[in-house]
From Swiss-Prot:
SUPFAM superfamilies: FAD/NAD(P)-binding domain (SSF51905). GO terms for biological process: tRNA methylation; tRNA wobble uridine modification. The keyword Cytoplasm applies. The keyword Ribosomal protein does not apply. The gene is mnmG. NAD(+) binds at residues 276-290. InterPro entries: FAD/NAD-bd_sf, GIDA_C_N, MnmG, MnmG-rel, MnmG-rel_CS, MnmG_C, MnmG_C_subdom, MnmG_C_subdom_sf. It is found in: Cytoplasm. NAD-binding protein involved in the addition of a carboxymethylaminomethyl (cmnm) group at the wobble position (U34) of certain tRNAs, forming tRNA-cmnm(5)s(2)U34. This is tRNA uridine 5-carboxymethylaminomethyl modification enzyme MnmG. It comes from Lactobacillus gasseri (strain ATCC 33323 / DSM 20243 / BCRC 14619 / CIP 102991 / JCM 1131 / KCTC 3163 / NCIMB 11718 / NCTC 13722 / AM63). GO terms for molecular function: flavin adenine dinucleotide binding. Homodimer. Heterotetramer of two MnmE and two MnmG subunits. Pfam families: GIDA, GIDA_C_1st, SAM_GIDA_C.
């Protein structure tokens, strides 16, 4: 292919999925002339799998993206068809917002945002080869021969990298949803010395909603109380005309059909070589792994207002189409369901993420960043969070400024990236609340308090929005001071209220703050019983209530964070030679050499490293006896 010189940009982003759009928008909004390349303009921010955003941990990531100035929260708030808060009966650390998306509107709204963003050019092309000179990425070459030069490049190839779709005995080269695969770029990455591996994910069948018998299912409506992902959304805009999802179950007949056809299941016949996601297994995998269960939950989710396609959630499969039909028809409510699209598995290349820095810049090629599913994660939200960080750092790199990172105590995005670059991953990585040590600090409700300041410093939060944020912080401080001054006396009204929430009687007057610390006592109750208005904004009330009720636990986590910061401050020299440190265990030495931790805190998080190895490394550095620098 003959090449030709095309335009120059500050930042080029390859791939316009959920990672790519965040990366491109961030770079452009930071003032960099940005090019966003995509294999197909009709698949910008497309949802090839579940038509939803949020859920446990993931919903918090969307709030963090919004607090930093990203787009996902605004986009889903403009295009959802249902909104629900999950885990409302549990503590604030695990509450999670989830939205059912109109997948077509989601794509169109995001594409419109990109097309109207100054500094950002959107173009359809396939990136085939990177331009690398003197260990730095200087641009790329497309399949049409165009040479684009740039100061920074971000790769977000998703599942397109040497993608292969599998449906029973049928296999063919393809990206998600039958789009073109990217073949030459992963080959080019291997030539440049990157280690790649194969992962697999899957998607369930879609059925015609007109052929579903909903009377045999359980309706799952949205919340009436206004909920939003973006801190800029207004309660008055909350959608009242929401669409319901529906729940049904597999049964022993379904499981018998699956077991009878396991010899034709690519998951078990050896056709699929890639490692699949542990936390999103196929239905055939669930039936085999959990043989004692006689049923599995299935959610029927509408894909949008202007389509009858129904996503059969938790029913991911790569069985042959005829077997998929039998499986579907055995499920209550789906006996006469007509298949519109079969489920499929897709295998694809991922980069081993330990080859990345916390900025998501690659270690062996400067100014090259990777984000999203190609880093080994699963999920739109995980991809978008990485895309935002990669885009920010690509812009900073183009400006010759220091990189931007998030610590484990600052954001779920920080936990996600640290896990990837420190531990790598042997399977598609899904963010879970259990992965965060400081999850009481990393709540869904306080993402703005944690990150808006950082977004403003980066130039991604407007002055108007920042002023509103400052006003909210001041309102929280005023409400906290006010509730501590209020006294609740043991009146008959107070005693009746306490009895209604199953709390012990009050023997003497207490401050409103101490009264609120009691289980099931609310901020509104303190206002009513004291006869005083302490705050008007429900989000301000929420912050005060959580801060007081969980004061002891939050204090405990902050003590742990102080220890983390002390260890993070103990930096490890970039060119340290671990082979020159005596007494280090072989496994620790090998892991340190491979991952090249930046601090003692990161070294501590590497699996296979024991306390003795850390003590040796720490002492060696503290004594100033830095191992010989490699020549």
């Amino acid at each position: 292919m003959k090449t030709y010189e095309s335009n120059e940009y500050d930042v080029i982003v390859v791939g316009a999925g959920h990672a790519g759009v965040e990366a491109a928008l961030a770079a452009a909004r930071m003032g960099e002339k940005t090019l966003l390349l995509t294999i197909n303009l009709d698949m910008v921010a497309f949802m090839p799998c579940n038509p939803s955003v949020g859920g446990p941990a993931k919903g918090t990531v969307v709030r963090e993206i919004d607090a930093l100035g990203g787009e996902m929260g605004k986009n889903i708030d403009a295009t959802y068809i249902q909104m629900r808060m999950l885990n409302t009966g549990k503590g604030p650390a695990v509450r999670a917002l989830r939205a059912q998306a109109d997948k077509w509107q989601y794509h169109e709204h995001m594409k419109d945002t990109i097309e109207n963003e100054p500094n950002l050019t959107l173009r359809q092309a396939v990136a085939d080869e990177l331009i690398v000179e003197d260990g730095a990425c200087k641009g790329l070459i497309t399949n049409t021969g165009a040479k684009y030069h740039a100061k920074s490049v971000v790769l977000t190839t998703g599942t397109a990298a040497r993608g292969k779709i599998i449906i029973g005995e049928l296999t063919y080269s393809s990206g998600p949803n039958n789009s073109l695969p990217s073949i030459k770029l992963p080959e080019n990455l291997e030539k440049l010395g990157f280690k790649l591996r194969r992962f697999k994910t899957g998607t369930p069948p879609r059925v015609d909603g007109n052929t579903v018998d909903y009377s045999k299912t359980q309706e799952e409506p949205g919340d009436k109380e206004p909920r939003h992902f973006s801190y800029t959304s207004k309660d008055s805009d909350y959608l009242k005309d929401q669409m319901s999802c529906y729940m049904t179950y597999t049964n022993t007949v379904t499981h018998d059909i699956i077991r009878a056809n396991l010899d034709r299941a690519p998951m078990f016949s050896g056709v699929i070589k890639g490692v699949g996601p542990r936390y999103c297994p196929s239905i055939e995998d669930k039936v085999v792994r959990f043989a004692d269960k006689d049923r599995h939950q299935i959610f029927l989710e509408p894909e949008g207002r202007n389509t009858k396609e129904i996503y059969v959630g938790d029913f991911s499969t790569s069985m042959p189409e005829e077997v998929q039909l039998k499986m579907l028809h055995s499920v209550a409510g789906l006996e006469k369901a007509e298949l519109m699209r079969p489920g499929y598995a897709i295998e694809y290349d991922v980069i081993e993420p330990w080859q990345l820095k916390h900025t998501l810049e690659t270690k062996n090629i400067k100014h090259l960043f990777t984000a999203g599913q190609m880093n080994g994660t699963s999920g739109y939200e995980e991809a978008a969070g990485q895309g935002l960080i990669a885009g920010i750092n690509a812009a900073l790199s183009a400006q010759n400024k220091p990189g931007f990172t998030l610590q484990r105590d600052e954001a779920y995005i920080g936990v996600l990236i640290d896990d990837l670059v420190t531990k790598g991953t042997n399977e598609p990585y899904r963010l879970l609340t259990s992965r965060a040590e400081y999850r009481l600090l990393l709540r869904h409700d306080n993402a703005d308090l944690r990150l808006t300041e950082k977004g403003h410093e980066l130039g991604l939060i407007s002055e108007e929005r920042y002023a509103k944020f400052e006003a909210k912080k001041q309102a929280i401080s005023r409400a906290m001071a006010a509730i501590k001054k209020v006294t609740i006396h043991p009146t008959d009204e107070v005693q009746e209220y306490l009895a209604s929430v199953k709390q012990d009687r009050l023997n003497a007057g207490v401050s409103g703050a101490d009264f609120l610390k009691r289980p099931r006592v609310t901020f509104d109750a303190v206002e009513k019983l004291s006869g005083q208005t302490l705050a008007t904004d429900r989000y301000v009330k929420e912050q005060v209530e959580i801060a007081l009720k969980y004061e002891g636990y939050i204090k405990k986590e902050k003590t742990l964070v102080d220890r983390l910061h002390r260890l993070e401050s103990k930096k490890i020299p970039v060119d340290i030679d671990y082979n020159a440190i005596p007494s280090l265990a072989t496994e620790a030495r090998q892991k340190f050499e491979k991952i090249r931790p930046e601090s003692i805190a990161q070294a501590e998080r590497i699996s296979g490293v024991n306390p003795a190895d850390l003590a040796i490394l720490t002492a060696y550095i503290q004594q100033g006896r830095i191992a010989k620098i490699k020549k």
